[in-house]
Amino acid sequence: MNYKIKGIITAVGDIKTTKLGTAVQQLHFEQETGRMFYPSALGTKIELLQDMLPGDVAELEFHICGSKGMYNNVIIDTIVRV
């Protein structure tokens, strides 16, 4: 199931690599309600974050992954600056 929310990017993390070799980059995202949200981009989805800067307003589409421990289980599918 995919979810879509709108909010403000407050920080873009560094690219890291999991023990299995997957590239991961985390985003700090403040929803319109004021709640903080910390989704992760995996693998080639990291390219979606290259143009994003703190303060940008964006629409984020994501899904929840059952795998926990290696990375945040909220996975970015698409992100578009609005």
Give the residues covered by each predicted segment.
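Single-stranded nucleic acid-binding surfaces, predominantly the OB-fold ssDNA-binding core
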Residues: 1-82
